[in-house]
Amino acid sequence: LQEYAHIVSHDLKSPLRSVSALATWLYDDYKDKLDENGRYNLQMMQEKVEGMDKLIEGILKYSTVNSDTLDNTDVDVNEVIHNIKEIIFIPEHVSIQVMGTLPIIQADQTKIHQLFQNFLSNAVVNIDKEVGVVEIACEESSKYWQFSIKDNGVGIPKEYHEKIFKIFQSIGNKERSTGIGLSIVKKIIDRYEGKIWLESEIGVGTTFFFTIKK
């Protein structure tokens, strides 16, 4: 799967870059001659190309989760969250809050960053309240770290509680979702002999729980 994903990625990204460049040139050269509908269609073309690019990147990441060697070091989860908040899209009405102090764990820095980034990116775009909140917390047991990520978003129907961890399964904001993020999360947690589950109420929000073995 990994080798196939890399080949497909290379073959698909080249024409995508060409389409993106052509759309940009058309917009720059003819925006004064196009009507509002024409300009809108070119912008939509760019957005669809960007969405396809994200999908390809997601497939690549999914294909490499199990093949990469885990380089376990001391990982400060507080620092990971801080770094993620600096790079992901967070709507103005949403805040990400850390409840207490998160631990320093023995894990692969890249994988833990990938894990939380997928969780948080998924959470912030599915909040429909005027004031959106995402809360991150952690509890310690003798063998595991148990993390929770709670949001006051749209909620997830019961019938999707298992499906969303499978590749290409998504609900809610389909424009921003590739259907890969939570499947990557599941594979990373599996590598740390952990479990993942959720509690959700439609219109109230969702809390994801997951464990990572010490």
Regions found by a protein language model. Give the residues of each.
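Short beta-strand/loop element within the Bergerat-fold HATPase_c
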Residues: V133-K143
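Conserved micro-motifs of the catalytic ATP-binding
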Residues: N66-L70, G100, I104-A107
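Short alpha-helical segment of the dimerization/phosphotransfer core of two-component systems
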Residues: E47-M52
